[in-house]
UniProtKB/Swiss-Prot annotation:
GO terms for molecular function: ABC-type taurine transporter transporter activity; ATP binding; ATP hydrolysis activity. InterPro entries: AAA+_ATPase, ABC_transporter-like_ATP-bd, ABC_transporter-like_CS, ABC_transporter_ATP-bind, P-loop_NTPase. It is found in: Cell inner membrane. It comes from Shigella dysenteriae serotype 1 (strain Sd197). Its main location: membrane. Keywords: ATP-binding, Cell inner membrane, Cell membrane, Membrane, Nucleotide-binding, Translocase, Transport. It catalyses: taurine(out) + ATP + H2O = taurine(in) + ADP + phosphate + H(+). The keyword Cell inner membrane applies. The complex is composed of two ATP-binding proteins (TauB), two transmembrane proteins (TauC) and a solute-binding protein (TauA). This is Taurine import ATP-binding protein TauB. GO terms for cellular component: plasma membrane. It comes from the Bacteria. SMART domains: AAA. The gene is tauB. Part of the ABC transporter complex TauABC involved in taurine import. Responsible for energy coupling to the transport system.
Length: 255
């Protein structure tokens, strides 16, 4: 379980997050949504251990987070892949740093690539892949170390609408298959409503938790309902419009 208690943090010397309290249980998919500059990415970087926080605590499985760790896998918007390595070696890179023997790490990488639908692309280089394929490699790399928690920072923001839909459904299938805790940062309202088991809205400016919304659309998808059916459901449309109105309220209040 991820437990965030009374978290305060700065960014660029200015307060960015104020009194954040969140819990992410095993098997849940928490989505954090808010206007630009509300501290979404700062929150993810704190959980990943990339930057220090000023007050409060972040704990995973009862242990305080004070730096990066293999129990947290991170997927970035820009992928962060190594262009001089092929796809399989990119996925295996973290395992290499951990001292895993070569044949074992390549086998793990191969299995992860199968999970994300890239079987047969192991020897390609990053420049030979589409944007969606590169994000699949990033997800496979994050999963290779078998982390307790998967963190994703707007991973589909640069993709076209069709590819974004494919990646959303892939991530939901992986979430169901692995049972991992997942925390997704996004600015896309429809994506947030579709994918979250709990949606956290952050306020503009100094990031505070504005509202927490339990949702069931992701569970409906993994239970077998199509994404098209879900997104055309009046309940989904009403929730999307409600969240949109809340985000616009924050933008207007901060402008």
């Amino acid at each position: 379980m991820l437990q965030i208690s009374h978290l305060y943090a700065d960014y660029g010397g200015k307060p960015a997050l104020e009194d954040i309290n969140l819990t992410l249980e095993s098997g849940e998919l928490l989505v954090v949504l808010g206007p630009s500059g509300c501290g979404k990415t700062t929150l993810l970087n704190l959980i990943a251990g990339f930057v220090p926080y000023q007050h409060g605590s972040i704990q995973l499985a009862g242990k305080r987070i004070e730096g990066p760790g293999a129990e947290r896998g991170v997927v970035f918007q820009n992928e962060g892949l190594l262009p001089w390595r092929n796809v399989q070696d990119n996925v295996a890179f973290g395992l290499q740093l951990a001292g895993i023997e070569k044949m074992q790490r390549l086998e793990i990488a191969y299995q992860m690539l199968k999970k994300v639908g890239l079987e047969g692309a192991e020897k390609r280089y990053i420049w030979q892949l589409s944007g969606g394929q590169r994000q699949r490699v990033g997800i496979a790399r994050a999963l290779a170390a078998n982390p307790q928690l998967l963190l994703l920072d707007e991973p589909f923001g640069a993709l076209d609408a069709f590819t974004r839909d494919q990646m959303q459904t892939l991530l939901l299938k992986l979430w169901q298959e692995t049972g991992k805790q997942v925390l997704l940062i996004t600015h896309d309202i429809e994506e947030a409503v579709f994918m979250a088991t709990e949606l956290v809205l952050l306020s503009s400016g100094l990031g505070r938790v504005l509202e927490r919304l339990p949702l069931n659309f992701a569970r409906r998808f993994v239970a077998g309902e199509s994404s098209r059916s879900i997104k055309s459901d009046p309940q989904f449309i009403a929730m999307r419009e409600y969240v949109l109105s809340r985000v616009f309220e924050q933008r207007e209040a901060f402008s």
